[in-house]
Amino acid sequence: MARKVRVAAVQLNPDLDTPTGTVDRVITAIADAAAQGAELVVFPETVVPYYPYFSFVQPPMMSGGEHMRLYENAVVVPGPVTDAVSAAARRHGIVVMLGV
């Protein structure tokens, strides 16, 4: 018989000021999902640092600064962001899919 897995799909608002703020929100969401019995926690694409929402509302020539900020805040794998999320997953005994 197939084993059932409880999955949590997380939708959260990133901290647009700092990737660290978003990572804190991700770690809190992991703990909350695990407390509710989730075995797999899934986050949206590019949740860290954040989704380039401005691509839909600004012409490309006006988005250079935001693109540079995304580049500067890009997640390095492995690195501090993946280390923190991995530690939270280990601590709660769950699997995490994080879009970076």
Residue ranges and their predicted role:
Residues 1-100:
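Hydrophobic structural segments
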